[in-house]
């Protein structure tokens, strides 16, 4: 198989970036010719080295993430695509929410499969933001992949198709050994948030919980960065520690091993939150909004609290306190939560699913 992958401007250690790098690495290691195009050069250096060691032809626009304009990205991508037409690509696998995938498809020949992968919820609110160019991408793709069953269903509704499918993220975690021990009875609990610090993720709810006397037995730990919440926003908040963003698997593992639970009070529909998948790799329970694809993760009932109305502070607090009580009473199971991850999201499992999908004819 000859596989051409395109992902829009990469961050150093983002979720979509990790998925695409791992797919490219897996394909190359399996003996398939693989090229990876991205419209920035902000990918972490260790990822560049891994890809090149595996034999991936990595092509990056020589500009930092967020600095190149639309014309510059389109022109660079067109030149790269025309050069890549010398190879007959069996699969052209594009990603993201933009119209530039159409340029990469110019590398297709008769018989090439054109796959497009959507990584967010694709709900009605999101659809209102789609450009005409991106709608053409969804309509013209030979195959559509959603990051959750919820997303796949919304893609079908939006396009009038009936063939979008779900495939899980290929991700890896530093947790290759059994998860850490559960907290002892009566111990102060450590609840955390992991991800981009934006207003739709429920950070204001966490700030209220940290100041709430009903939650005095809980410490709060924030791991992430984003424009809506500069570090000083968390200064002098009692029971709360801001750690900044992690930039690699070692920092990610250190963040998770120090937590007892994770929260995600999204007020919008999620595709399938990668932070919760990685939380489950560590065997940690979580509290999250019952929005988008998130309920698809809630298999181990005692380790998952779904909040139906994340805008309702009292409902969020009640869910946190229920999980805290179960943690103190020894009624959560890190082994059960980890088992769900191993069955559905472990790298070996998902790698095999993606390679089977990409190589089918």
Residue locations for each model-derived region?
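Short hydrophobic beta-strand element within catalytic cores of glycosyltransferases
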Residues: 285-288
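Conserved acidic donor-binding segment of nucleotide-sugar-dependent glycosyltransferases
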Residues: 300-314, 322-328
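N-terminal strand-loop element at the rim of the active site
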Residues: 6-13, 19-20, 26, 30-69, ...
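A charged, aromatic-enriched C-terminal amphipathic alpha-helix characteristic of glycosyltransferases
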Residues: 311, 328-359
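A conserved mid-protein helix/loop that constitutes part of the nucleotide-sugar donor-binding site
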Residues: 14-22, 193-212
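Short His-centered aromatic/hydrophobic patch
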Residues: 94-100, 118
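Nucleotide-activated donor-binding/catalytic signature segment of Leloir-type glycosyltransferases, i.e.
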Residues: 231-250
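A short, active-site helix/loop in glycosyltransferases that binds the activated sugar's phosphate group
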Residues: 139-164, 171-173
């Amino acid at each position: 198989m000859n596989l051409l992958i395109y992902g829009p401007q990469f961050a150093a250690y983002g979720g979509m970036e990790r998925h695409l790098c791992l797919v490219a690495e897996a394909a190359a290691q399996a003996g398939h010719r693989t090229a990876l195009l991205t419209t920035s050069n902000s990918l972490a250096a260790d990822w560049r080295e891994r890809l090149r060691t595996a034999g991936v032809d990595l092509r990056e626009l020589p500009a930092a993430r967020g600095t190149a304009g639309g014309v510059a990205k389109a022109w660079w991508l067109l030149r790269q695509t025309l050069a890549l037409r010398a190879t007959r690509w069996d699969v052209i696998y594009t990603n993201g929410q933009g119209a530039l995938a159409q340029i990469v498809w110019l590398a297709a020949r008769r018989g090439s499969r054109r796959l497009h992968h959507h990584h967010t919820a694709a709900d009605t609110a999101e659809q209102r933001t789609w450009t005409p160019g991106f709608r053409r991408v969804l309509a013209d793709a030979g195959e559509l992949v959603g990051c959750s069953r919820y997303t796949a269903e919304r893609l079908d509704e939006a396009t009038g198709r009936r063939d979008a499918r779900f495939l899980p993220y290929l991700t890896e975690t530093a947790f290759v050994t059994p998860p850490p021990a559960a907290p002892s009875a009566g111990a102060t609990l450590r609840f955390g948030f992991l991800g981009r610090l934006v207003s739709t993720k429920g950070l204001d709810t966490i700030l209220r919980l940290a100041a709430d006397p009903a939650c005095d037995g809980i410490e709060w730990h924030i791991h992430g960065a984003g424009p809506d919440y500069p570090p000083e926003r968390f200064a002098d908040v009692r029971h709360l520690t801001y750690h900044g963003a992690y930039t690699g698997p070692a920092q990610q593992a250190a963040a998770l091993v120090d937590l007892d639970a994770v929260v995600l009070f999204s007020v919008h529909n999620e595709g399938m939150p990668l932070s919760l998948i990685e939380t489950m790799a560590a065997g940690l329970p979580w509290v999250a909004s019952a929005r988008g694809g998130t309920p698809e993760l809630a298999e181990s009932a005692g380790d998952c609290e779904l909040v139906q109305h994340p805008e309702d502070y009292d409902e969020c607090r009640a869910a946190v306190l229920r999980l805290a009580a179960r943690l103190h009473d020894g009624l959560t199971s890190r082994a059960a939560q980890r088992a769900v991850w191993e069955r559905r999201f472990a790298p070996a499992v998902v790698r095999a699913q993606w390679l089977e999908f990409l190589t089918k004819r």
